[in-house]
Amino acid sequence: QGAFSSNANFYLASIAFAKKDMEEAKRLFSLVLESGDTKFREESWARKAEIEYLDKDYAAAMESFKHLQAVAENPENKEAAKLGLMRCAELTGQPQEALLAANDLLKEPKLSPEIMSEARYVRAKAYISLKQENKALADLKEISKDTRTIHGAEAKYLLAQLYYDNKDDTTAQTVLMNFIENGTPHQYWLARGFILLADIYIRQGDDFQARQYLTSLQNNYKGDDEIAAMIEDRLGKLKK
């Protein structure tokens, strides 16, 4: 009876999952897991974790990914568990957990370039959150080689910001000039780069150059975010 019902529940759960009836699928996968039948355990944890993650229930998903990691034999599920743990840790603001999960994921032998870049990005951000900025440099340098990606564009800006925070204006300036030269489709991070460049000029006492960059950005940036306020704030201070 038990084996039959877990067979049936797994089959019905898979149908519900395929039909995008996620609540029913989660209920049925949970029943399979509660039955103690090991035949469908790995796939049930994988699907349950995926449903919880898509539902933005990151705390529950994190627990399910931990269970999946413990039982996974399929290489795809092993990688999915590590990736899921890393993403959930980052999304729930747990840098230490995110760092451990990223390191674990980066040990996987056949990661795609996109996943490798994401793991390096998460690791770098975790180091920055943990006030270990210097440990983030290697990852930021690597990811920022490709500013076509959102992670690459943000990494380029963060790299310059770290140099600026360390009072190394020359290197920060070089990174930003390279960013401007190479460009990026991610205009928000390029705009943050322009503002940081203006901050460098302000610190160096070159208010004229700072104003030029800020005014140019003000006239050309079309995004609806905090960039406009950041420009106003700096231009206001330059007028004093």
Tell what function each PLM region has.
Residues Q1-K240:
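Acidic, polar-rich low-complexity tracts and alpha-helical solenoid repeat scaffolds
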